Amino acid sequence: MASEGIKVISDNRKAYHDYFVEEKLEAGVILTGTEIKSIRNGRVNLKDSYARIENGEVWLYQLHISPYEQGNRFNHDPLRKRKLLLNRSEIIKLVGKVQQQGLTLIPTKIYLKRGLAKIELGVCRGKKNYDKRQDIAERDAKREIERHFRDQGKGY
């Protein structure tokens, strides 16, 4: 995704902490005018958001987009549910994974691609507490090894 024309607005780092992200897909999102202006200003929070499939459509819940300052009476509800745009085949594939395998749809990133807001949707499996502790231990061990090699190269 290091292509020109893509500007990452917000990352959901908590998703990588709480879930194993097994697959990622790109989805468009239906927004109002003041919502896209707030997103371009970077006033969006993905932290507690999730997606759900209802009647063959994918909906995004709890995505907080702050009201636009100059929006006056045309401003939007910050937490309204928003429809995601996916191909029919992608939705059918997601239905099977979510219902039978017990996976969850979590937005991992929101970005602008050629002027359009896109959401990177992760198909995720929840982590248990011992998985989180194991990840933290691995990260600390890796950091310690890198520190050791860095100091060894300096001659300490």
Swiss-Prot record:
Q: Where in the cell is it found?
A: Cytoplasm
Gene3D superfamilies xref list: 2.40.280.10
The highest taxon in the source lineage is Bacteria
Broad class of the protein's primary localization: cytoplasm
UniProt record, GO biological process: trans-translation
User: Which UniProt keyword terms apply here?
Assistant: Cytoplasm, RNA-binding
Molecular function GO terms recorded = RNA binding
Recorded hits in Pfam families, A to Z, give: SmpB
Presence of keyword RNA-binding? yes
Query: What GO cellular component entries does it have?
Result: cytosol
Homology family: Belongs to the SmpB family.
Q: What does this protein do?
A: Required for rescue of stalled ribosomes mediated by trans-translation. Binds to transfer-messenger RNA (tmRNA), required for stable association of tmRNA with ribosomes. tmRNA and SmpB together mimic tRNA shape, replacing the anticodon stem-loop with SmpB. tmRNA is encoded by the ssrA gene; the 2 termini fold to resemble tRNA(Ala) and it encodes a 'tag peptide', a short internal open reading frame. During trans-translation Ala-aminoacylated tmRNA acts like a tRNA, entering the A-site of stalled ribosomes, displacing the stalled mRNA.
Q: Return the HAMAP family for the record.
A: SmpB
Q: What is this protein called?
A: SsrA-binding protein
| Species this chain originates from | Desulfitobacterium hafniense (strain Y51)
